Amino acid sequence: MKTALMLIAHGSRNAAANDDLYALAEELHHARVYAAVEASFLELAEPTIDAAVRRCLLQNAERVILLPYFLSAGVHVRRDLQDHRDRLAQEYATVEFILA
């Protein structure tokens, strides 16, 4: 089963603040552990979660691990990301979405 890893951060209007996530995604991509590695942001930056999922699916991912990249497990991690996972699972019923 082709598994993709999708890193999800909050996002910032300050583009430089988002660079760490892009760098981590690039390093993980080069490790070739996953069929695809994508960075995504909950808000304020691109790509969005939906856009990153589409990129994973274009690379034929059958499973997508949604990995939160947050300092603490606040409302976004405990509630919002679970809501995204549930919606994606309904929209793409043939793909397994795992919220790590």
Where are these regions (language model features)?
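Active-site-proximal alpha-helix that buttresses catalytic centers in soluble enzyme cores
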Residues: 1-100
